[in-house]
Regions:
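Non-catalytic positions within long, well-ordered alpha-helices that form the structural scaffold/packing
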Residues: 9, 60-61
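Short, glycine/polar-rich helix-capping loops at beta-to-alpha or helix-loop-helix junctions
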Residues: 51-55
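Short beta->alpha connector loops at strand-helix junctions that form conserved
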Residues: 70-71
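Short, structured coil segments at secondary-structure junctions
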Residues: 62-63, 85
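Active-site pocket-lining/capping segments in soluble small-molecule metabolic enzymes
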Residues: 1-13, 17-50, 75-182
């Protein structure tokens, strides 16, 4: 994994998904020692399985720039995490059949209220098979993309109706770490 990170940095990547606290600690130590660029960020995957405030406090102390809590946390559980950390939460709103399937679109105004700053995630698609080039046609993939965009539009409108005081990030906020071209 470390060799992959180093190669991706050479290609311009500035954000990395990390699944393990030990790997997070090692990468952050490398960053502090200037073995990795200062502008690199580490986001903790949902597969790390963090579901409480103590776990997120640990992630923040290890250098996480953001973290994905497990997908089915209640509003009070999300609020408890928010009460102890300042890092953005990456919260899954739509999961498809390949990951158990659920839809929390109508909860997004309240999730944003208790968990902001947060990013909402809709992934990965109709199934892991879509990542195989022979699994779905280009037209099907394009339609899936349009549906995700429609969901995002609906979420933004819903939050604006229920909690107009909340702000939605502008396109391409700096903390997303869009790759830089070298």
């Amino acid at each position: 994994y470390l060799m992959e990170v180093e190669r991706c940095i050479e290609l311009g990547f500035r954000g990395f998904l990390v699944w393990d606290e030990g790997v997070l600690s090692l990468l952050n130590t490398m960053k502090q020692n200037r073995d990795l660029p200062e502008d690199i960020v580490f986001k903790v995957s949902i597969f790390a399985g963090h579901a409480n405030a103590a776990g997120f406090r640990l992630l923040e102390s290890l250098g996480a720039a953001s973290g994905n809590p497990v997908a089915d946390l209640t509003l009070p559980e999300l609020a408890s995490i928010r009460s102890v950390v300042s890092l953005p939460l990456d919260i899954h709103i739509q999961l498809w059949s390949s990951m158990g399937g659920f839809n929390r679109i109508y909860e997004t105004p309240e999730i944003a209220r208790v968990a902001s700053p947060c990013y909402f995630k809709m992934e990965p698609g109709t199934g892991l098979g879509m990542y195989m080039p022979w699994g779905m046609s280009d037209d099907m993939l394009a339609e899936l993309g349009r549906e995700k965009i429609r969901s995002v539009k609906n979420i933004i409108e819903l939050i604006g109706q229920v909690h107009p005081e909340l702000k939605v990030s502008k396109q391409g906020p700096k903390d997303l770490k869009i790759p830089v071209l070298n």
